[in-house]
Amino acid sequence: MQTFRRALLVAALLAIAAPGARGQSAPLNPANAKPFLGVWVIEMTEPAVFKGTHTIRVWDNGGTVAASLQTNPNFPAIEATGIHRDGNMLVLTLSHNAKPHPMMENGMPIWAVVSAVVDGNTMKVAQMLERSQTIKRGAGNRQN
């Protein structure tokens, strides 16, 4: 299982780096992201040491999909720098160029990849952080 998780993390990080090498893909159309649109409050439950509430917002930004991740209610949301749909999964990337600031860990900017799957009224999330072997997991419901 650990090997699978590492392979998933490597694949996700390659997906982040690959668009720069082969050119950007077309922006995601809101009609193709309809199940994901909204504000989702996610209770991160695994691993237990990282329990907490995250908010994922996905919206129609003038004909393209935009998204943000807020990991703490006391800090501003961070806008996703990459948004891709792969089958029933929405993949968000937050790079060192994220606005208003990149995600930080131990004072250093880090990349983050968030995969989300909507199952009925529930969004299931896995969050992978650069330089970490831990995959954070959680689930939550749409708030609007």
Predicted regions and their residues:
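Bacterial N-terminal signal peptides that target proteins for export
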Residues: M1-L9
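Central antiparallel beta-sheet cores of small beta-barrel/beta-sandwich binding domains
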Residues: Q24-V118, A126, Q133-T134
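Short, solvent-exposed mixed-charge patches
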Residues: Q24, N141-N144
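Sec/Tat signal peptide C-region and signal peptidase I cleavage site
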Residues: P19-G23
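Bacterial N-terminal signal peptides
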Residues: L9-A17
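A conserved amphipathic terminal alpha-helix motif
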Residues: N121-T122, N144
